[in-house]
């Protein structure tokens, strides 16, 4: 199965504002990628956000899916959800709080656009387009290391239908941007004989 969470974690590692450290021994403040069940549930981000000083991506691991209508053979569409989070810059001036809140939301929107550009670039690459000449080496490395399963999964992402929205302030100046994206599972819906007795 295509794992979008693995691809997004790799993006957080190479994206300069985040620079996620994926090591199991990383300090909480070195992390910028978190797996969560749902935002409303207690999770690692919520337990450590007061130690964080950089934007983060919180990927929801709950599974939402449906059968693709009119697909023959039958396929499954998955709904992927995640949150981008960033802390409002403190000005020390309560009168500037509204401007700081606006800037935090605009920063999140810029990060989302950067992430979409990354995903669109990879989708074009798996469809045979060459990477842009000014494409960062880290993005090239990811593109060149994609497995066949990753390539099919990226090709099935419905990037043109991506939706995102800003949410009210979470806590202590942390703002959220919720994201929804659908993807067509490249596997056909069929019986796998080895899974039966």
Please give the residue ranges for each predicted region.
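Acidic-leaning, charged glycine-interspersed low-complexity segments
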Residues: 104-184
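Oligomerization/assembly interface segments of phage tail-like spikes and tubes
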Residues: 74-91, 169-187
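Small/polar-rich, solvent-exposed N-terminal microdomains that initiate assembly or binding
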Residues: 1-72, 130-147, 151, 197
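Short linear interaction motif-like sites in intrinsically disordered regions of transcription factors
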Residues: 12, 40, 83, 165-166, ...
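Acidic, low-complexity intrinsically disordered regions
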Residues: 7, 35, 78, 160-161, ...
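Sequence-level detector for tyrosine residue identity
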Residues: 15, 59, 78-83, 125, ...
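Extracellular/virion structural assembly segments
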Residues: 2-6, 71-77, 85-128
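Mixed-charge, glycine-accented linear interaction segment located at domain edges/termini
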Residues: 186-195
């Amino acid at each position: 199965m295509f794992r979008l969470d693995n691809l997004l974690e790799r993006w957080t590692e190479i994206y300069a504002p985040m620079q996620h450290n994926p090591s199991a021994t990383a300090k909480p403040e070195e992390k910028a990628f978190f797996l969560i069940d749902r935002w409303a549930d207690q999770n690692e981000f919520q337990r450590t956000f007061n130690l964080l000083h950089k934007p983060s991506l919180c990927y929801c691991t709950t599974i939402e899916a449906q059968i693709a209508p009119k697909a023959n053979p039958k396929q499954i569409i998955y709904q992927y959800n995640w949150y981008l989070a960033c802390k409002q810059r403190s000005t020390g001036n309560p009168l500037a709080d509204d401007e700081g809140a606006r800037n935090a939301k605009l920063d999140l929107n810029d990060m989302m656009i950067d992430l979409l550009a990354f995903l669109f670039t990879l989708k074009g690459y798996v469809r045979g387009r060459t990477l842009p000449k000014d494409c960062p080496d880290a993005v090239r490395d990811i593109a060149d290391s994609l497995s066949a399963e990753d390539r099919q999964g990226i090709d099935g992402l419905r990037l043109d239908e991506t939706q995102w929205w800003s949410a009210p302030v979470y806590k202590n100046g942390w703002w959220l941007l919720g994201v929804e994206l659908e993807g067509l599972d490249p596997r056909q819906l069929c019986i796998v004989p080895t899974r039966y007795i």
